[in-house]
A protein has these predicted regions:
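Short hydrophobic/Thr-rich beta-strand motif most characteristic of the beta2 strand and flanking loop
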Residues: 37-45, 53, 212
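Acidic catalytic/metal-coordinating carboxylates
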Residues: 46-49, 71-78
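Receiver (REC) domain active-site loop signature in two-component systems and cognate sites
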Residues: 68
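Acidic, metal-coordinating helix/loop segments flanking the phosphotransfer/catalytic sites
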Residues: 45-61
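Short, flexible helix-to-coil linker/hinge segments that flank and couple to helix-turn-helix
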Residues: 104-109, 114, 119-170, 174, ...
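Active-site residues of response regulator receiver
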Residues: 19, 65, 96
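Basic, Lys/Arg-enriched C-terminal extension of HTH/homeodomain DNA-binding domains
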Residues: 207-242
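Recognition helix of helix-turn-helix DNA-binding domains
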Residues: 182-217
Length: 242
């Protein structure tokens, strides 16, 4: 991963862990609290408890398992973010052993900012927390490839209207399509022969015009608008959408 994330001097990233396995919660807590600049503010055994704890502990990032009793991680994510779409809402990083496409797409639509498998190396998990806390989006590379391949090839339902891109310029459409294909800002800049700062400007305008909370939601917009129907998946080695 090549994304440098700076949370500011002395900034502490507050993390809440939601997983139904006590050993997993303990392992994640030990890993996170061994790193300067991060602290675990709570641990939940199910989605309902995660929603309750978030209200009182104000985490920056929630590590959310998918399959949990009482309330699964996707529903918990939906409830957390449905009531608070501004910058104060926590960023949700889905962690699971399941890399099935329906989980990825549903999690992103629920508002998750990232999706990683539980066998991700510890250093990559810590990087992911920093990336998510900084407002970027992240998908495990293997998940990104499957998501792109699945939805680029999926036939468009006749009854489902495409998402409107009214007000989006031709150049912004190009950028949005490349975001949907898994490219980082640096890769988009190379692809379109633009300065990376220019790409960042286009991304910022897309976020505003499409009322997207973060880059993960731009990926969903690219699929729902039909931009990828005539394009194959791009080859990207990066899971971080920087």
């Amino acid at each position: 991963m090549d994304t440098a994330v700076n949370m500011g001097s002395g900034a502490m990233i507050r993390v809440l862990i939601a997983d139904d396995q006590a050993l997993v919660r303990g392992a994640f807590k030990a890993l996170i609290e061994a790193v300067p600049g991060m602290t675990v503010v709570g641990a939940a055994a199910d989605g309902a408890e995660a929603v309750e704890l978030c209200a009182g502990h104000d985490p920056d990032v929630v590590l959310m398992d998918v399959r949990m009793p009482r309330m699964d991680g996707i529903e918990a994510t939906r409830r957390l973010l449905a009531r608070d779409h501004d910058a104060t809402a926590p960023r949700v990083l889905i962690l699971t052993t399941f890399d099935l496409d329906e989980y990825v797409f549903t999690a992103l639509r629920a508002g998750a900012s990232g999706f990683l498998l539980k066998d991700t190396p510890p250093d990559d998990l810590l990087t992911a927390i920093r990336v998510i806390a900084a407002g970027e989006a992240l998908l495990a590379p293997s998940v990104t490839r499957r998501l792109i391949a699945e939805f680029a090839a999926r036939p468009e339902p006749a009854s489902s209207p495409r998402r409107s891109l009214a007000g989006v310029t031709d150049r912004e459409r190009e950028v949005l399509a490349l975001i949907g294909r898994g490219l980082s800002n640096g890769e988009i800049a190379l692809h379109l022969h633009l300065a990376q700062a220019t790409v960042k400007t286009h991304v910022g305008r897309l976020l505003a015009k499409l009322y997207a909370r973060d880059r993960a939601q731009l990926v969903i917009a690219a699929y729902e608008s039909g931009l990828l129907n005539d394009q194959g998946p791009a080859s990207s080695s990066l899971g971080v959408f920087a």
